[in-house]
Each structure stands twice: as C-alpha cells, then as structure tokens.
Design a protein with these regions (language model features):
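Hydrophobic, small-residue-rich transmembrane alpha-helices and their short perimembrane loops
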Residues: 1-315, 319, 325, 336
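Eukaryotic, compositionally biased intrinsically disordered regions
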Residues: 331-335
Length: 336
C-alpha cells in the first residue's frame, strides 16, 4: 500500500505538480460512498451475531454471522486503507499550502532543530494512539464493574425477571468518549501552535512531515492488525489446527486470542481510524497559524505583498491590503 501511495504521489506531482496531488486526494475522496458501505457491513454483521447469541438461536445461525463478520473485518480494513491514503494526500496538499503561506523555500533536515521536530512529529501518533487505547481500556473496565454491580444488586436478571439498567452502561461509554478524548485532541491542537510560535515555521514543517509519515504507517498497520486479531479469535468457532491438534472455543489458544482481540478492537476501531483525523487536523491548524509565523514580515504579510497594476504600458505598485479597498476607477487612475 505504501509503494502504491508513493507512486500515486510521484505521478500526480510529475503531471500537474502539487495541484495534481490535490486532485488525486479529491479523486480518492470520491470513493466515500463505497467506503461508507464497506465500513457499515462489518458492524451490521457483528450486531447480528450478538443478537443471535443473546436470542439463543441455533448454532448454525451464529456460524453464518461469524463468517459474515470475518468478511466485514477484512472489508473494513480495506476501507480504512483507502481512508488513510486519502488523508495522506490531503495532508500533503495542506502541507504545500502551509509552506507557501509561511514563506518557507525549503525545509533543511541538516538543521538540528528541524531534525528534532521531525522526530517529535514521528512520536506524536504513538502518543495519540496510546492515549486512545488507554481510554478504551478504562471505559471498558468501568462498564464491566457496572455490569457486575447490576448482577450483584439486581436479582433475577439472568432469569429475565428483572430489567437491567442499560442507560447506565450507555452513560459510561458516552462520558468516557468525551472526557478521555480531551487530552489527545489537545495534543493535536496545541503542538502545532506551540512549535510554530516558539521554534518557527521550518521546525513546524519538520513536525508535520514526521506526523504524516508516522501517522500513515500507524493507521494502516493498526487497521490491518486489529482485523487480523479479531478474525483469529473467530476462527476458533470452527476449530484451528495447531501442530496437528484441533483447538476450539474455550481452549487455551482461544483464550489467548480473546486477549489479543482486546487490543485488536481498539486498534481497528479507535486508534487506527483516528490517525486520519490527527494528520489532517495538525496540518489544518498549522495552515491557520501560518500567516502569523511567516518568515517574511509579520502576521499580515499576506496582504502587505506588493501588487503591480499595469494600464496603458504604465504601472504602479501598492500593497494588496490597500488595493482591495479601492474600486476599479480609482485603481486605473492611480496607475495612470
């Protein structure tokens, strides 16, 4: 996938420059409808399997839903690959816009501070991913404790004589999804601002390059690895041959695969897809602050660039900030 992505970037740039890269990103975004359909397939099959098991339907029903869910995990990994590739192309286009507005002619990795920024940028996706996975684990344990409490304090749940307090479990997941994402979101927003205003636009360019490269690799790896772990767990439903011996559900290898899936699910559903958001958000924040940290001039340099007006072989030069305030007759008169 990385070689294909690199080839797409090189060919797009060769034929139409950075504009071609932007068009390539737009072209990949054109597959959004297909990606949504692919991503929706897996959760639907997974929910169908859960309903079949809770309803105590025949085992062949659960077997069919497991097969569908395994296919869903594979298609979801494919769809996430498209998403991360389009995010990489979009980030590259935003990066080019940042370089232009910030007035950078080149980013020299021989400079120690730029190289340091490159390393810091490469580290950010790992921190972001760790925080996301940790948040999932904390929320899951809170929900497990709540379920245990309900079994302990509300008699008759398993005999269908009492109704569980579903809303409390929903509240736990909702609250965790908001509160636990404050720190990862703050990292994506604050780091570009902090680096840009303290170290300058060239170092910030190094950070963005590191985030993009590391984030794309992490996103593809986590989406594929998470789907593989999930499918490995499901394969024990029919039996897995390990060194000539068949192992089924509730065996020791199956228990190990369940443990692996507790990492795989956050990989493929949380931290993997979040890499798309991270690399695009940091590029957008950098683009927003670019005029304020530009190499040439102050924060309003974009409107202070000289504009030359030519009328009847004569010309006049004034700043864009002044030019946009004048109407056409005034500009013509001024030029004359």
């Amino acid at each position: 996938p990385i070689i294909t992505l690199a080839a797409g970037i090189i060919l797009s740039y060769k034929f139409a420059g950075l504009y071609g890269v932007s068009i390539a990103a737009a072209g990949m975004m054109a597959t959004t409808a297909m990606q949504l359909a692919i991503d929706a397939f897996g959760p639907i099959a997974d929910n169908a399997g859960g309903i079949a098991e809770m309803s105590q339907l025949p085992s062949e029903v659960r077997g069919r839903t497991d097969n569908l869910d395994a296919v869903g995990n594979t298609t979801a990994a494919t769809g996430k690959g498209f998403a991360i590739a389009s995010a990489a192309l979009t980030s590259l286009a935003l990066f080019a816009a940042f370089v232009g507005i910030a007035g950078i002619t080149q980013i020299d990795i021989y400079k120690a501070d730029v190289l340091a920024g490159l390393f810091v940028g490469g580290m950010i996706p790992f921190i972001f991913s760790a925080l996301c996975i940790s948040a999932v684990g904390k929320a899951a344990m809170e929900m497990v404790n709540e379920v245990r409490r309900q079994f302990r304090e509300i008699p008759g749940i398993m005999e269908y004589k009492a109704e569980p307090e579903y809303e409390k479990c929903v509240a736990i997941s909702t609250e965790a999804s908001i509160k636990q994402m404050i720190l990862p979101g703050a990292i994506a927003l604050i780091v570009p601002v902090l680096v840009g205003f303290t170290m300058g636009p060239e170092v910030l360019g190094g950070v963005l390059a590191g985030v993009t490269v590391s984030g794309v690799l992490m996103g593809i790896f986590q989406s594929n690895a998470g789907g593989a772990w999930d499918n490995a767990k499901k394969s024990f439903e029919k039996g897995v041959n390990i060194d000539g011996q068949m192992y089924y559900k509730k065996s020791e290898p199956h228990k190990a695969s369940v443990t692996g899936d507790t990492v795989g699910d956050p990989f493929k559903d949380t931290s993997g897809p979040s890499m798309n958001i991270l690399i695009k958000l940091m590029s957008i924040v950098s683009l927003v602050i670019a005029p304020y940290i530009a190499v040439k001039g102050d924060h309003s340099h974009a409107t202070k660039a000289p504009v030359e007006i030519k009328v009847e072989n004569q010309s006049a030069s004034l700043t864009k900030a002044t030019a946009i305030k004048l109407d056409k007759p005034t500009l013509t008169s001024l030029s004359k």
